[in-house]
């Protein structure tokens, strides 16, 4: 029993000194980040897809904090653009896609899937479920359409399909910017 107390007595001062040293180092050598970039990064979807032209969400957040446009994130969509506009006190802008494409989700042709799990490892939002050497499937509500699962698939059994319009993601058209007759009378 004395050996246990002796070991505790010997290790306790070493642990306390190590903890104090780590605490001091954390305060002394702290890396100051941009708080605006951290807040912007928290709003981005963290898919690391690169569709915005940056290698990941953190570099894009830093670019937004430095003044870049807030409308380059297709997986985040309009909800992210509105949240960023509210945070930065900017006007929301329409999504700046290279070409206007409808929302898409990944679809795995399960009969062709060999269960290699490479698509699961590539998916940044864990929208693909399955096990090794068994078929995989995509949870459509979780998929952001980032296309990162397509390239690693060795049998090309993954395709991107357009999401059909329904009430959950249908967008109302913007009203016409022209004045209506009653507004013209008041303006005159």
From Swiss-Prot:
Binds 3 [4Fe-4S] clusters. Residues 1-26 are annotated as: Hydrophobic. InterPro entries: 4Fe-4S_dom (IPR007202), 4Fe4S_Fe-S-bd (IPR017896), 4Fe4S_Fe_S_CS (IPR017900), Elect_transpt_cplx_RnfB/RsxB (IPR010207), RnfB/RsxB_Proteobac (IPR016463), RnfB_subfamily (IPR050294). Residues 32-90 form the 4Fe-4S domain. It holds the Pfam family FeS. The keyword Acetylation does not apply. Its cofactor is [4Fe-4S] cluster. This is Ion-translocating oxidoreductase complex subunit B.
């Amino acid at each position: 029993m004395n050996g246990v107390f002796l070991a505790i007595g010997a290790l306790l001062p070493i642990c306390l000194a190590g903890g104090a040293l780590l605490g001091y180092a954390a305060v002394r050598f702290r890396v100051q980040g941009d708080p605006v970039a951290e807040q912007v990064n928290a709003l981005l979807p963290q898919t690391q897809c690169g569709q915005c032209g940056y290698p990941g969400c953190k570099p894009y957040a830093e670019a937004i904090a430095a003044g870049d446009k807030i409308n380059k994130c297709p997986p985040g969509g309009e909800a992210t653009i509105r949240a960023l506009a509210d945070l930065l006190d900017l006007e929301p802008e329409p999504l700046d896609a290279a070409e206007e494409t409808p929302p898409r989700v990944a679809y795995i042709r399960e009969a062709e899937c060999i269960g290699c799990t490479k698509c699961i490892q590539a998916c940044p939002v864990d929208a693909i479920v399955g096990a090794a050497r068994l078929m995989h499937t995509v949870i459509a509500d979780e998929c952001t359409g980032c296309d990162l699962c397509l390239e690693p698939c060795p049998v090309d059994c993954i395709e991107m399909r357009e999401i059909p319009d329904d009430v959950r993601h249908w967008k109302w058209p913007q009203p016409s910017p022209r004045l209506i007759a009653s507004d013209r009378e008041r303006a005159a």
